[in-house]
């Protein structure tokens, strides 16, 4: 009788290295398609949006590639956070990635409704650019952390480190939104409400959904 080997930890799953290499190539290709896009993401992390709200130039190919990098990296981190024991499967990772993509699509739809309701197309486009730059920085941080976390066999340490990274990400988003919007106490309360409803709540939904998928 032949014994079928099982993937019992992330580091022993050969597909993980290929996925991480693919995500790295996505970042490199995006930088080649639009030179300076990654550097710009880091240099504008705490920049304040100009009040002129000028036209924003978009490169659709670069945006598509960077979205693949962001979703793929965050899905890997989410899978690793929800992972307990047993097989570390590529199919499960794809399901988690699809779950992340679905939540992002809902957030985008909500943002589009806000844009349509308040007629803030130019301002919304510029804010979206700054937001995408911020998430590029956050996912670069997650990617570097994953290179370490995928090679250790300590689920408790992995969860705590990923939780700490998530808290740092939320703090960065909070600081960025204060830089963009905060003018008085009312705007500050709006920012807090936004962070809770469109950042923290979706993150909790992602974690719960990933837990069901992995189980």
Show where each model-derived region lies.
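Terminal transmembrane helical module of multi-pass membrane proteins
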Residues: 142-215
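Alpha-helical transmembrane segments and their membrane-interface exit regions
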Residues: 26, 47-50, 100-105, 166-174
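Membrane-interface helix-boundary motifs at transmembrane edges
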Residues: 53-61, 85-90, 120-127, 154-156, ...
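N-terminal juxtamembrane cytosolic/stromal segments of multi-pass membrane proteins
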Residues: 1-65, 75
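Alpha-helical transmembrane segments
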Residues: 11-28, 90-103, 155-165
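Hydrophobic alpha-helical transmembrane segments of multi-pass integral membrane proteins
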Residues: 24-25, 63-81, 102, 106, ...
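Membrane-water interface at transmembrane helix exits
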Residues: 30, 39, 43, 78-83, ...
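Alpha-helical transmembrane segments with an aromatic anchor "belt"
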Residues: 82-151
């Amino acid at each position: 009788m032949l014994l079928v080997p099982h993937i019992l930890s992330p580091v022993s799953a050969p597909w993980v290295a290929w996925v991480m290499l693919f995500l790295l190539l996505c970042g490199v290709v995006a930088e080649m398609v639009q030179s300076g896009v990654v550097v710009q993401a880091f240099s504008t992390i705490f920049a304040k949006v100009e009040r002129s709200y000028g036209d924003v130039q978009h490169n659709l190919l670069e945006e598509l590639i960077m979205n693949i990098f962001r979703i793929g990296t965050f899905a890997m981190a989410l899978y690793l956070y929800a992972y307990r024991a047993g097989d570390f499967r590529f199919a499960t990772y794809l399901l988690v990635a699809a779950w992340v993509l679905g939540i992002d699509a809902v957030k985008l739809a909500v943002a589009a409704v806000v844009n349509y309701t308040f007629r803030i197309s130019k301002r919304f486009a510029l804010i979206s650019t700054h937001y995408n730059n911020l998430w590029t920085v956050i996912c670069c941080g997650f990617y570097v952390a994953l290179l370490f976390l995928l090679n250790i066999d300590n689920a408790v340490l992995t969860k705590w480190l990923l939780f700490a990274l998530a808290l740092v990400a939320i703090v960065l988003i909070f600081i960025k939104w204060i830089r963009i919007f905060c003018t008085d106490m009312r705007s500050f309360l709006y920012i807090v409400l936004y962070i809770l409803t469109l950042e923290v709540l979706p993150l909790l939904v992602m974690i719960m959904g990933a837990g069901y998928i992995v189980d």
